[in-house]
């Protein structure tokens, strides 16, 4: 009888083509997502070697990082480098027979939102993309992670990847989430607990009552930020919530094939007694809405808390880095989080740009107005999310409140397009990274949930969403 295995063990074992004595494996890749930033050199390598894309039907190309989100984006991209990358992806996709969603296609959007909504992402698969937040797809019980440009070329040419197996980590979130606390708060709390290096060398499986109660959108938010916790990937075992989400998607199995697939997917869970190298537990019932205060995703505190004092940190190097973060953020220890005013609000990204996120934000702002000191924007994660939101009338709620209603793309998550912070501007953002300069040169980022960001836009400062009227 074989030893109990984790979910990660099972998917890994199913995809090993060959294994060397030192543990290096050749892993088969089921799905490859491609965007314009990390693919040009990879496709150029194929051109120079005269190689085809081995499995174009298992590859999907989407433009997302560089595209403008302004309503007039059809007029073209002003930045020359960005325009060249977008044009190169369109040309390469055509040359190699890869399906491509341009900015003119309503299916276009952020690659990690597009994959799941098209049914391209399925349980038990290995999925890669030249983007660190590929971990998002792990919400379906898939082994998904980012790869470098040279690896992008390798997967395009061979449909395989050279890898060494990571260790197993279990993060169990027990109990029920209080009102006003979301998946974003869970994952920020996890990163605050383990630190940005806590998951280094591991693949994380998320489990527990609070995780099971989440929608697929919430689960994608959790897995999306696994990389911010240092992990290679994040996984959640598929269940009925997963299967219902997949049914009817354009590229998902149909009919009897779907039923056969579901029977297999039901085996994708960690066996009782399976070994985890590290286990972390959190009590969902005690979690508050969370706000980041520094320049690392581990710098988090309750919305009812205060900016911490780095002098309380024993480690000299870490203490110095936190003082630097406070200096960059323009904050002082002891400042109440609810006293921090914001200049900008960004609701979107592959972390929180889905329909559920927009519904949560709309519920907060309906009938209210954005503070006169705040510039706020909503960027749907895909054309289909935008279409659904408009069908529900959410765009009218946002526009009447004073938000900018934009076209889909990565937008202000990163300063690679026209949406960026000016030096010194402070932003409540639903994205995943608050590094120095991430949203614009000398811009200051606070990571929050969509509801918290929406409330900050109305109030002009952070507020406890649990007390929102």
UniProtKB/Swiss-Prot annotation:
Keyword annotations from UniProtKB, A to Z: 4Fe-4S, Amino-acid biosynthesis, Branched-chain amino acid biosynthesis, Iron, Iron-sulfur, Leucine biosynthesis, Lyase, Metal-binding
Pathway field: Amino-acid biosynthesis; L-leucine biosynthesis; L-leucine from 3-methyl-2-oxobutanoate: step 2/4
Residues that bind [4Fe-4S] cluster: 350, 410, 413
Class of this enzyme: lyase
Cofactor: [4Fe-4S] cluster
Catalytic reaction equation(s): (2R,3S)-3-isopropylmalate = (2S)-2-isopropylmalate
CDD domains linked: IPMI (cd01583)
Cofactor notes: Binds 1 [4Fe-4S] cluster per subunit.
MF (Gene Ontology): 3-isopropylmalate dehydratase activity; 4 iron, 4 sulfur cluster binding; metal ion binding
Database matches in InterPro entries: 3-IsopropMal_deHydase_lsu, Acnase/IPM_dHydase_lsu_aba_1/3, Acoase/IPM_deHydtase_lsu_aba, Aconitase_4Fe-4S_BS, Aconitase_4Fe-4S_dom, IPM_dehydratase_rel_enz, IPMI_cat
EC identifiers of the protein: 4.2.1.33
Record Gene3D superfamilies: Aconitase, domain 3
GO biological process terms held by the UniProt record: L-leucine biosynthetic process
Pfam families, alphabetized: Aconitase
HAMAP family documented for this protein: LeuC_type1
The protein's role, per its UniProt record: Catalyzes the isomerization between 2-isopropylmalate and 3-isopropylmalate, via the formation of 2-isopropylmaleate.
Record's subunit section: Heterodimer of LeuC and LeuD.
Family to which this protein belongs: Belongs to the aconitase/IPM isomerase family. LeuC type 1 subfamily.
PANTHER family cross-referenced by the UniProt entry: 3-ISOPROPYLMALATE DEHYDRATASE, HOMOACONITASE, MITOCHONDRIAL-RELATED
Protein name: 3-isopropylmalate dehydratase large subunit
Taxonomic lineage from the root: Bacteria, Pseudomonadati, Pseudomonadota, Alphaproteobacteria, Hyphomicrobiales
Name of the gene this protein is made from: leuC
